[in-house]
Amino acid sequence: MDGNGIGSTGKCPVMHGGNTAMGTSNTDWWPNALNLDILHQHDSKTNPMGPGFDYRRALQGLDVTALKRDLHALMTDSQDWWPADWGHYGGLMIRMAWHAAGSYRTADGRGGGGTGNQRFAPLNSWPDNVNLDKARRLLWPVKKKYGNAISWADLIILAGTVAYESMGLKTFGFAFGRADIWHPEKDTYWGAEKEWLAPSDSRYGDVADPASMENPLAAVQMGLIYVNPQGVNGEPDPLRTALHVRETFARMAMNDEETVALTAGGHTVGKCHGNGDAALIGPDPEAADVVEQGLGWMNHSTRGVGRNTVTSGIEGAWTTHPTRWDNGYFDLLFGYEWELRKSPAGAWQWEPIDIREEDKPVDVEDPSIRYNPIMTDADMAMKMDPIYRPIAERFHRDPAYFSDVFARAWFKLTHRDMGPKARYLGPDVPQEDLIWQDPVPAGRTDYDVAAVKARIAASGLSVAELVSTAWDSARTFRGSDMRGGANGARIRLAPQKDWEGNEPARLATVLGVLEGIAAETGASVADVIVLGGNVGVEQAARAAGFEITVPFAPGRGDATDDMTDAASFDVLEPIHDAFRNWLKKDYTVSPEELMLDRAQLMGLTAHEMTVLLGGMRVLGTNHGGTKHGVLTDREGALTTDFFVNLTDMANVWKPADANLYEIRDRRTGAVKWTATRVDLVFGSNSVLRAYAEVYAQDDSREKFVQDFVAAWAKVMNADRFDIA
């Protein structure tokens, strides 16, 4: 027999090659091997829409007025299978949108609501997202009706925004343009814990110091969006919680005023659910039985819906009128003294010591019954923290100001990961430019590109100087939140001009020349920087025997200091760059893993990463002019020498120091070159070696140049949403 059980009574009569629950994977055998999967996500093999589908074009056929009308109607169309609290789904839809957008973190730009990732694991099954599967299922008839003209990503955020409008808030605006993904994201690190809601301590150097939370995380526990509503590790202490609220919201790009506004505005409507026994709740959607059809947390033992729903375990509404936008949150927060109590589900919550009957919210099903309002530990932080309280008091005194600040903060929360305003679509896009959008003015397109290139070529700047400067300007781009990139030429502004990774002294010299050329020709500095890199690449290709023109589209603008929130760019500072063979310091994560992470953020595939790194090495662009990995005696020529010499068995590779290796002549033992781990991994990893061997072949010299130029142009244009 062949071991597959074919022909054996009682055994599985199918091959096990495609079985998802059995067998041993490569990752099981070699858990520490470099995993390139994060570079191979979201391609045509998983996307059912086909290569010709363009969501931005599909949006042009969307009847936005009709869609919003249908969403308004949905809010009060209660369904028996999941009844609306007080007959209004607004609170549920807002929580869905909040928890989609609120997973964003500034450190790497990942998370957020820009991809519809809440539909997939792990987010669809997070403890903090209990019963949001019901919100998305309630939206399904709307999605079904409008089809491909509206993505799930846009619909989820729009539903939350319309929910606020339906309850009386004048919102700041809304932009369409979020395209869906079709499988779970593999690149986002949510933490190392192996259990939901594991104690916070493992993700902090010291849990008493919120700033010591592990980067890039922005939530206090695995499976939460930001803080534990019952207190740090479930132990109520509003002043302690306030410190963690401040840190987690800062990691979501929010200042103190925005934090108070979002907390209060998010809790002005809706309620918490904990009127029942959490032990009766079934498994999450990913673990639920097939008969649940993608829903989770089902209660088949008791009623489990309406007033008997269990979600967070906390039970009650924050305000007297939970389906109405008003200032009731602050009225109750400051109007009463509060004490700790336990919910029916056993969760800690704050309730008023003594409250007028008319200030109590009514039952979600029977308006003749009233219950105490509640506050979470985070809500009490708004009252007790010495920084948050004055902000909350101002909001209490000035409801119009509160509404405006909240509307703006909600817009920021739900659009922060969309990138610049050029990506916004739809009739409700606000006219006002906001500094967190990293605005860039339009650049000229009517100048003589050939004349600019001629001036650059005659400037005396070397290939390495031109290519390095263009690369440093463009490499900040992150496909996660669409920030960074060459457009705007912010490399000449603080803080980028002073970043160690940009070699400030060298950068200032090169920029001095390029800025002069820009002034003389009418081109933007941003365009001239990119053109400089293109000129360098073309010169290097010519030195290798190939004439090629790097694609270029003029029109980049130059940002100013007034358009730049310098502090917000700190998270974009490169602390490593494998393409320029540089590490700011030693890290616990291996250099090759850091390389993969950066390549993924830049939107590169594995073969694009390979060809770019090999090309950058022979162009002599290493940080500080080091020679590590420069495996050529023709530096400055765009040759395949890096791959030829890396794969040459006439050489041997010996460790010389931490992250430093010597490449020696196998016969004589003479040192020929030095290299780092990110160089040698292209010969040691089986997949990367396969790519390296392609470019080392004798018939691949021209292919290498063509592939390098294509990948280079992709990096230079990654942020050109104005021409996409």
Swiss-Prot record:
<dbReference type="GO" id="GO:0070301">
    <property type="term" value="P:cellular response to hydrogen peroxide"/>
</dbReference>
<dbReference type="Pfam" id="PF00141">
    <property type="entry name" value="peroxidase"/>
</dbReference>
<keyword id="KW-0479">Metal-binding</keyword>
<keyword id="KW-0408">Iron</keyword>
<feature type="site" description="Transition state stabilizer">
    <location>
        <position position="95"/>
    </location>
</feature>
<dbReference type="InterPro" id="IPR010255">
    <property type="entry name" value="Haem_peroxidase_sf"/>
</dbReference>
<feature type="binding site" description="axial binding residue">
    <location>
        <position position="267"/>
    </location>
    <ligand>
        <name>heme b</name>
    </ligand>
</feature>
<comment type="function">
    <text>Bifunctional enzyme with both catalase and broad-spectrum peroxidase activity.</text>
</comment>
<dbReference type="GO" id="GO:0046872">
    <property type="term" value="F:metal ion binding"/>
</dbReference>
<dbReference type="GO" id="GO:0020037">
    <property type="term" value="F:heme binding"/>
</dbReference>
<dbReference type="InterPro" id="IPR019794">
    <property type="entry name" value="Peroxidases_AS"/>
</dbReference>
<comment type="similarity">
    <text>Belongs to the peroxidase family. Peroxidase/catalase subfamily.</text>
</comment>
<dbReference type="GO" id="GO:0005829">
    <property type="term" value="C:cytosol"/>
</dbReference>
<keyword id="KW-0560">Oxidoreductase</keyword>
<feature type="cross-link" description="Tryptophyl-tyrosyl-methioninium (Tyr-Met) (with W-98)">
    <location>
        <begin position="226"/>
        <end position="252"/>
    </location>
</feature>
<feature type="active site" description="Proton acceptor">
    <location>
        <position position="99"/>
    </location>
</feature>
<dbReference type="InterPro" id="IPR002016">
    <property type="entry name" value="Haem_peroxidase"/>
</dbReference>
<feature type="cross-link" description="Tryptophyl-tyrosyl-methioninium (Trp-Tyr) (with M-252)">
    <location>
        <begin position="98"/>
        <end position="226"/>
    </location>
</feature>
<comment type="subunit">
    <text>Homodimer or homotetramer.</text>
</comment>
<dbReference type="GO" id="GO:0042744">
    <property type="term" value="P:hydrogen peroxide catabolic process"/>
</dbReference>
<keyword id="KW-0614">Plasmid</keyword>
<keyword id="KW-0376">Hydrogen peroxide</keyword>
<protein>
    <recommendedName>
        <fullName>Catalase-peroxidase</fullName>
        <ecNumber>1.11.1.21</ecNumber>
    </recommendedName>
</protein>
<keyword id="KW-0575">Peroxidase</keyword>
<keyword id="KW-0349">Heme</keyword>
<dbReference type="InterPro" id="IPR000763">
    <property type="entry name" value="Catalase_peroxidase"/>
</dbReference>
<dbReference type="GO" id="GO:0004096">
    <property type="term" value="F:catalase activity"/>
</dbReference>
